[in-house]
UniProtKB/Swiss-Prot annotation:
Keywords: DNA damage, DNA repair, Hydrolase, Nucleus. One of its GO terms (cellular component) is nucleus. Dephosphorylate DNA's 3'-phosphate termini. Has a role in the repair of breaks in single-stranded DNA. One of its GO terms (molecular function) is ATP-dependent polydeoxyribonucleotide 5'-hydroxyl-kinase activity. Its EC number is 3.1.3.32. GO terms for biological process: DNA repair. The lineage of its organism: Eukaryota, Fungi, Dikarya, Ascomycota, Saccharomycotina. It catalyses: a 3'end (2'-deoxyribonucleotide 3'-phosphate)-DNA + H2O = a 3'-end 2'-deoxyribonucleotide-DNA + phosphate. This is Polynucleotide 3'-phosphatase.
Length: 245
């Protein structure tokens, strides 16, 4: 099927220290207190996983699938149920991507990740239930610090929208979980989107919970997700809690 002239539902922004996908036409429906309810998630091994059994990382852009913690419903089904049942819901994904380098943007790892998320978003859009979820879904990823910054101490040329971070040598660390930089950018982007839409910004972002698999348990590779939730002062939930009904 031809898609010429068809606007993609999300716009991607690739910075040296951050990758984000924001809806082109975001939808905000406030609750009675003029608040948005934020449901936040990790991505890998929380919402999706590689198709290859027992694999930790995706081998290609299409090597992923939605997870099933419940035999009856996939993680995508649960995301759809959130936006179906909560009109004030906004879903945001925060993901550390230590294997992705965005300098240059044409790097193999960056291209693979961008294509992977594009396919992820396409899977949502192609589902008849996607029209509610897609305009309320935001995705943020923290890539790896490029070696050139570390070894040659070269100054990165930042786009105009983030020149204020030019002289911040810790910006790469600040956007990686458990630090809260990605959430800070999300707050800014929500406010900016409201201004573009000529909509009154929400009085408050009501963080319902943050869900991730890196909780410092015996078999977990990290505790970055649970520490991230603590720094945000947000309730933490394991994927098994959210996606098993």
């Amino acid at each position: 099927m031809k898609t010429e002239g068809r606007q993609m539902p999300h716009k991607s922004t690739i910075l040296p220290f951050l990758i984000k996908f924001a809806p082109n036409s975001p939808q905000f429906t406030y609750d009675c207190d003029q608040c948005l309810n934020v449901y936040a998630f990790d991505l890998d091994h929380t919402i999706i996983k590689p198709k290859s059994p027992n694999a930790k990382y995706s081998r290609s852009a299409n090597d992923w699938q939605f997870m099933n913690f419940d035999s009856k419903k996939s993680t995508l089904d649960y995301l759809f149920s959130i936006t179906d049942n909560d009109l004030a819901a906004v879903i945001v994904i925060f993901s550390n991507q230590g294997g992705v380098i965005t300098v240059p943007r044409t790097s193999k790892s960056c291209s693979k990740y961008i294509n992977k998320i594009s396919l992820f978003l396409k899977a949502i859009e192609n589902d008849k239930r996607g029209e509610k979820l897609s305009p309320r879904l935001w995705i943020y990823a923290a890539p790896k610090r490029p070696k050139t910054v570390v070894t040659n101490n070269k100054k990165i040329t930042f786009p105009s929208l983030c020149k204020s971070y030019n002289n911040d040598p810790e910006i790469f660390e600040k956007v990686r979980k458990p630090m809260t930089g990605m959430a800070d950018f999300f707050r800014i982007d929500i406010t900016d989107a409201c201004r573009v839409l000529k909509t009154v910004p929400p009085i408050k972002l009501n963080w319902v919970y943050y869900c991730g698999d890196a909780a410092g348990r015996k078999n977990d590779f990290s505790d970055s997700d649970i520490k991230f939730a603590e720094k945000l002062h947000v309730e933490f939930k394991y994927p098994e809690e959210v996606f098993q009904g």
